[in-house]
Amino acid sequence: MDAKVEDNIAGKCPMGHGRGPANRDWWPQSLRLEGLNQHAPRSNPMGEAFDYAEAFKSLDLDAVVSDLHALMTDSQEWWPADFGHYGGLFIRLAWHAAGTYRITDGRGGAGGGQQRFAPLNSWPDNTNLDKARRLLWPIKQKYGAKLSWADLYVLVGNVALESMGFKTFGFAGGRADQWEPEELYWGPESTWLDDKRYSGERELDSPLGAVQMGLIYVNPEGPNGNPDPLASARDIRETFARMAMNDEETVALIAGGHTFGKAHGAGDASLVGVEPEGGAIEAQGFGWASKHGTGKGPDAITGGPEVIWTQTPTRWSNHFFDNLFKYEWELTQSPAGAKQWQAKNAPADIPDAFDPNKTHVPRMLTSDLALRFDPAYEKISRRFYENPDQFADAFARAWFKLTHRDMGPIGRYLGPLVPKEELIWQDPIPAVDHPLADDKDIAALKAKILATGLSASDLVSTAWASASTYRQSDKRGGANGARIRLAPQKDWAVNNPPVLAKVLAALEGVQKDFNASAGGGKKISLADLIVLGGAAAIEKAAKDAGTSVTVPFAPGRMDASAEQTDAHSFEALEPRSDGFRNYRGPGKHYMAPEEALVDRAQLLGLSGPELTVLVGGLRVLGANADGSKDGVFTNRPGALSNDFFVNLLSMETTWSPTAANAFAGHDRKSSEPRWTATRVDLIFGSHAELRAFAEVYACADSQEKFVCDFVTAWNKVMNADRLDLAA
């Protein structure tokens, strides 16, 4: 096609790609709802009927593993394998695919195969992993829909370890691919490797998990390139903790990963070309072309350091710790100018990656030396050094956790390599071991719950508090397990502990009576009763508003024990802001209240209309965390009416701010006070899209639709964690 014709066509593209400012450019502070529409079925080329879990079950996993073993030593001319073995490259691929996980919001991780897309496919820390993905393409192509990229990235890391003599803990399939980039907040910076994410005494902003834009964890040269092992240890401890790793797991992962392979800094990094997303169309997504020598093999430049850690970089060993403790270290520079450390007075017994006649002295990164010079890390490292079996077990377990942390409950794990051991970080819940309540029982239980005298507000608030901890990101939280009765959830301010304790005590009484009297061994869990209490309250509230509705309910939840609950890990699920309950916790917030509302809705898997109808319903039901009247735009609280929308959109009210997140509504004519509100309430009248949804529910003929839509959205949240219902 003629270039002028191409230019003309592009200039007239009706979607305006690359032409003119978008709405977000004109109004950058406008609330964005795009995150609620991510991963819609229409973006999935497999179609809505495709079930990846079922497809994976038909996969010949042994054949895949065999093919991956063969790939490890099938060195390609276009990207030769270090030491004749791709193991180190594929360990890095798997690590970096999984290592974006952050416990603060459960986002990131290996699930979805996001490393195929920007920005991850072009992060500086992922330099040359495009080569690893291209090496895997023939295997992905061979097994097609039965093997997702997401599963393949993790599996190849396991096979790499096994092929080099390490016994892994196990592997679970079941990660379905996503088909568009995740809209995530990776940091405030607009340039790679910048670090505007800190405040105070190097306090890393939430929910971020890396020290600089475009890194997975830490700068291997030290904080901002400062080669200080103790300062590096501080960064390591913070970033690994945000990935849900303790000190022992951290030491095991760093030392285990750096037992293999090498870092590549063979020459001037300025000779490396652009990343995949910035490349020309003819490059076909192949990035970082280097003009240093051949640009590959011994001339490869990936980061900056040029380090080979051990004497056997393609075999599992204890050489990492042996070298770490045996030698003293002096600061040097790589050929690329990166700061690194070299062993003093050490023999040149490290093999070269490509020249069998060449050897090197041991080298380490600043982040490696942190494992020796930080007192807590040193103690663990020395124990691993003296007890190789403990090191191997710790690395196997930490690697499994790293690569499976975002998969959710063990019921999602697929395949013959799933380990049988129950791990506390999987948030285990007992299996159902009794007959479930039937429809007649459920009707009787609803009546008994309402007879306790608990208000609709109390019952709805408790059910919401229990279920709304769910995060579709890492599949943690939710009503199943009834962990709301355990620490730390029972003490969260957002859950109004005194009211929560009252509700739980009443429901436990109902549970005790039913379990003692029900025939046939039937039982009801507290987890089920909490959800059923919300359903009973909603049905009564709808009836009080003149609408008859039945809230769906499916028993089958169980109650987890304190021993099955890692209380420290669950602290990450505490809402610092929950617009559904008009809650704004103390301390620093990185999002405005309305942004936090949309963020929580995205974690719950809600659409814009679902978000809207839930807020409107929860307000009139009086579900505010502190019992305040903010946003309760009704003269009949407790009735499930569409009054929130009717009164919010009424031109009879004018609004004025009284504080940063507080507003007063007055009668337009008389100036008499009418309502109070927060930003989360008023956004449904201010934001054009949310107002459009609100208008639907404010219409004179919308009461029944409002109730039905509220119940549907409510049921979605209550069952968000019910893997058994989705099966």
Curated annotation (Swiss-Prot):
The gene is katG. Bifunctional enzyme with both catalase and broad-spectrum peroxidase activity. Important for stationary phase survival. There is a cross-link at residues 95-217 (Tryptophyl-tyrosyl-methioninium (Trp-Tyr) (with M-243)). Pfam families: peroxidase (PF00141). This is Catalase-peroxidase. One of its GO terms (molecular function) is heme binding. GO terms for biological process: cellular response to hydrogen peroxide; hydrogen peroxide catabolic process. HAMAP family: Catal_peroxid (MF_01961). Its cofactor is heme b. It comes from the Bacteria. It is an enzyme of class 1 (oxidoreductase). Heme b binds at residue 258.
